[in-house]
């Protein structure tokens, strides 16, 4: 019996979706570059899709593709296009047309449990949380998972595996072993903090300023700490 070396299967992946409305290409470039400058780590290696359902301007799709490539972003495709002529222009540029499915949207209902206990632990996924005072996650955060809490605090009451990523515009609280990456103040708020009961993080960041595991003083590793930003530098102290 021959082994199957290549298998084709359907699968779903999540990505950061940018919604374009009444905006021209020049302004879009300026806006996106400003966002990246504020939160460079957040945008690093993240797949991006564009929703042009309400786009009033006609873009030069070849130039758009070149722009994304020049700044190191991964544009995986475009969806929401209604005009066949525009679809054809997009395809000619080498960009794929994506088709949206309800279960692949990034806006999850907060009453539903995003984490499936029976899911494959190697499944790569992202969770984008609607605005609320704070967001609580009790499940283990597995490698490859990314959780983003816009305009709020993120609270984790379990362990965070290596390769997992926590992002919040507010503070981040981790009541478990933190082995992944934590990025607080993602939109530039320098007053935000990271609280961790057991620090073993690959990377910690506040308002774009970051510190890797190699830069974290050994005395703070495996300890309960409070992380803040002082004079644009990461400051760590024991949290007793």
From Swiss-Prot:
GO biological process, one term: regulation of cell septum assembly
Keyword annotations: Cell cycle, Cell division, Septation
Domain of life of the source: Bacteria
Keyword Cell division attributed: yes
UniProt keyword annotation of Cell division present: yes
UniProt similarity note: Belongs to the MinC family.
HAMAP family: MinC
Function according to Swiss-Prot or TrEMBL: Cell division inhibitor that blocks the formation of polar Z ring septums. Rapidly oscillates between the poles of the cell to destabilize FtsZ filaments that have formed before they mature into polar Z rings. Prevents FtsZ polymerization.
Oligomeric and partner information: Interacts with MinD and FtsZ.
NCBIfam families: minC
Name recorded for this polypeptide: Probable septum site-determining protein MinC
Protein's organism: Buchnera aphidicola subsp. Cinara cedri (strain Cc)
């Amino acid at each position: 019996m021959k082994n199957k070396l290549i298998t084709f299967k359907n699968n779903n992946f999540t990505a950061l979706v940018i919604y374009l409305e009444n905006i021209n290409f020049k302004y879009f470039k300026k806006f996106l570059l400003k966002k990246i400058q504020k939160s460079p780590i957040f945008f690093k290696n993240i797949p991006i899709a564009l929703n042009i359902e309400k786009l009033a301007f006609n873009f030069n799709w070849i130039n758009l593709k070149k722009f994304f490539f020049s700044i190191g972003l991964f544009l995986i495709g475009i969806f929401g296009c209604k005009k066949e002529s525009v679809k054809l222009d997009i395809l000619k540029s080498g960009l794929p047309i994506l088709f949206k499915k309800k279960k692949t949207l990034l806006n999850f209902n907060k009453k539903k449990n995003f984490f499936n206990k029976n899911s494959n632990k190697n499944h790569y996924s992202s969770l984008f949380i609607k605005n609320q005072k704070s967001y609580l996650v009790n499940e283990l955060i597995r490698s490859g998972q990314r959780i983003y809490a816009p305009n709020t605090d993120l609270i984790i009451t379990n362990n965070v595996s290596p390769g997992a990523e926590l992002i919040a515009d507010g503070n981040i609280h981790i009541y478990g072993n933190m082995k992944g990456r934590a990025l607080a103040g993602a939109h530039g708020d320098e007053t935000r903090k990271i609280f961790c009961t057991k620090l073993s993080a690959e990377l910690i960041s506040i308002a774009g300023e970051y510190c890797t595991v190699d830069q974290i003083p050994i005395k703070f590793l495996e300890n309960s700490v409070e992380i803040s930003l002082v004079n644009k530098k990461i400051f760590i102290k024991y949290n007793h």
